[in-house]
Curated annotation (Swiss-Prot):
The protein, known as: Ribosomal RNA small subunit methyltransferase G
Gene name of the encoded protein: rsmG
Main function: Specifically methylates the N7 position of a guanine in 16S rRNA.
Family: Belongs to the methyltransferase superfamily. RNA methyltransferase RsmG family.
Pfam family, one: GidB
Compartmental location: Cytoplasm
Length: 234
């Protein structure tokens, strides 16, 4: 876990001994569960630290004013939501994962890591986005490797409060994807404020798309389950 500690420190993020132990346990449990549930193609500890933990923690440099709540869309094995919860234990976190076996892993990790104020929602993002308990209730919305940005915007922006942020970790060559998504982002009440380069030791260059929520999302969005992916807003 030296790379985790040292890179986090270089980014100005402090991790204490308990947090390092939580990350070590997370890595071990992820590898154990991965033998029976398809959670990740990355199974060596160094890869898990670099491509999952550090890629997740990098979001904390871009979430603006200290948030009190975060929702992670398509959480899968918990990235980036759970590492950000470990980093900031005071965060109220919701993890949206529609696949039952992956949701079971998330609940297991919450128990094993003794995390408080974390909810797992076994549902589709479109359904959660229409629920008054969740709609426009979160300071930060994250989503990693879920969909193209135009579709992702329709999953995420309805859940983000005005003045909050959507953070979308992406690969390096995304200029065209961002351009295709601008109409959708603006219609949903957002604005792209940055596309930040991300450098992680041993990992190919990545980016983080930062979207500010500048206006409420129209009641027509999100559309029915499956529609944002089949017919993105253009």
């Amino acid at each position: 876990m030296d790379m985790l500690l040292n890179t986090a420190r270089a980014w100005g993020l402090r991790l204490d001994q308990r947090q390092i132990e939580q990350f070590a346990r997370y890595s071990a449990e992820l590898r154990a569960w991965n033998t029976r549930v398809n959670l990740t193609a990355i199974t060596d500890e160094e890869g898990i630290v670099a491509r999952h933990f550090l890629d997740s923690l990098r979001c904390a440099l871009s979430w603006g004013d200290a948030p009190s709540s975060l929702i992670d869309i398509g959480s899968g094995a918990g990235f980036p939501g759970l590492p950000l919860k470990i980093l900031r234990p005071e965060l109220r976190v919701a993890l949206v994962e529609s696949v039952g076996k992956k949701a079971a892993f998330l609940r297991h990790m919450i128990t094993v890591l003794d995390l408080r104020d974390v909810t797992v929602l076994t549902a589709r993002a479109e359904t959660v986005g229409r629920d008054p308990q969740h709609r426009e209730q979160y300071d930060v919305v994250t989503a990693r490797a879920v969909a193209e940005l135009a579709t992702l915007a329709e999953y995420c922006l309805p859940l983000c409060r005005v003045h909050g942020r959507v953070l979308a970790p992406k690969g390096s060559d995304i200029a065209d994807e961002v351009a295709r998504a601008r109409t959708a982002i603006e219609r949903l009440g957002g604005r792209v404020i940055d596309v930040e380069p991300v450098t992680i030791p041993g990992v190919e260059p990545r980016t983080l798309v930062v979207i500010a929520k500048v206006a409420p999302t129209l009641a027509a969005y999100p559309r029915a389950v499956g529609v944002p992916a089949r017919r993105p807003i253009h």
